Swiss-Prot record:
It holds the Pfam family YchJ_M-like. This is UPF0225 protein PSEEN1229. Belongs to the UPF0225 family. InterPro entries: NTF2-like_dom_sf, SEC_C_motif, UPF0225, YchJ-like_M. It comes from Pseudomonas entomophila (strain L48).
Length: 158
């Protein structure tokens, strides 16, 4: 059992916070998933980062790059500004946050409004660096069973 403080910034112990998501318990909402992903970067849990990215995007992820960035950075903190559902659809959400880290080039911060989708009881991060190859009439990449235009197209600005 770990007694370390969770890196996500809540002040809770890792095992009582993001640690149980890393162990397989689904995150209950988009903000919890985002916090657990930040903690996964701090802890070098690349498999977790891949597994919590939209399944349609997972083959396009740069696992080696993720691992290198995680290992070569000293993570300085996370601030969550907001978490909101999109258009009243509880399975679509945005989380706005700022992450700070230090590497050989100095101190950095990154502010992002990340998109998340829930499918089959699990939340997934939609990675803006990996293309979603879906036409408007194609099945939605989130696996909802709906056409892209009726599901995530408006949410993702497509």
């Amino acid at each position: 059992m770990s007694v370390s403080v969770c890196p996500c910034g809540t002040g809770n112990l890792l095992d009582a916070c993001c640690g149980h998501y890393h162990a397989g318990t689904p995150a209950p909402d988009a903000q919890s998933l985002m916090r657990s992903r930040y903690s996964a970067y701090v802890l070098g849990l690349v498999d977790y980062l891949v597994g919590t990215t939209l399944p349609a995007q997972q083959p396009g992820l740069d696992r080696a790059g993720m691992a290198a960035w995680s290992a070569q950075s000293t993570w300085l903190g996370l601030e969550v500004e907001s978490a909101e559902v999109f258009g009243g659809q509880p399975e679509h959400a945005f989380v706005t946050f700022t992450a700070r880290w230090h590497d050989t080039d100095g101190d950095h911060q990154h502010r992002e409004r990340s998109a998340f989708v829930q499918h089959a009881g699990r939340w997934y991060f939609i990675d803006p660096t990996v293309p979603l190859n879906a036409g408007r009439n194609d099945p939605c990449p989130c696996a909802s069973g709906q056409k892209f235009k009726k599901c995530c197209a408006s949410y993702l600005g497509s």
